[in-house]
Amino acid sequence: MSFKPLHDRIAIKPIEQEEKTKGGIIIPDTVKEKPMQGEIVAVGNGIRNEKGEIHPLELKVGDKVLYGKWAGTEIEIKGTKLIVMKESDVFGIIN
């Protein structure tokens, strides 16, 4: 992928919900919830403080994170769906 977010933004590849329930019922797209977790695939350089110094982000590529259902902006690059959001929109890292 050749996408690099700017400043304190990150790009996340959402982890999609299962297509079937444990009981074998297929879930149609119309009732699936928006994903709220994903894997970080790109991060910006960081945020500038008042002195112009760049503070790097805490999150890094490969982190699995939990974020708000409506956070960020959905984009598509070379057929891959991503969500771009600020680091502060992430609730936490999933271990």
From Swiss-Prot:
Its main location: cytoplasm. One of its GO terms (cellular component) is cytoplasm. It holds the Pfam family Cpn10. One of its GO terms (biological process) is chaperone cofactor-dependent protein refolding. One of its GO terms (molecular function) is metal ion binding. Keywords: Chaperone, Cytoplasm. It is found in: Cytoplasm. PANTHER family: 10 KDA HEAT SHOCK PROTEIN, 20 KDA CHAPERONIN, CHLOROPLASTIC. Belongs to the GroES chaperonin family. Heptamer of 7 subunits arranged in a ring. Interacts with the chaperonin GroEL. Together with the chaperonin GroEL, plays an essential role in assisting protein folding. The GroEL-GroES system forms a nano-cage that allows encapsulation of the non-native substrate proteins and provides a physical environment optimized to promote and accelerate protein folding. GroES binds to the apical surface of the GroEL ring, thereby capping the opening of the GroEL channel. This is Co-chaperonin GroES. It comes from Rickettsia conorii (strain ATCC VR-613 / Malish 7). The lineage of its organism: Bacteria, Pseudomonadati, Pseudomonadota, Alphaproteobacteria, Rickettsiales.
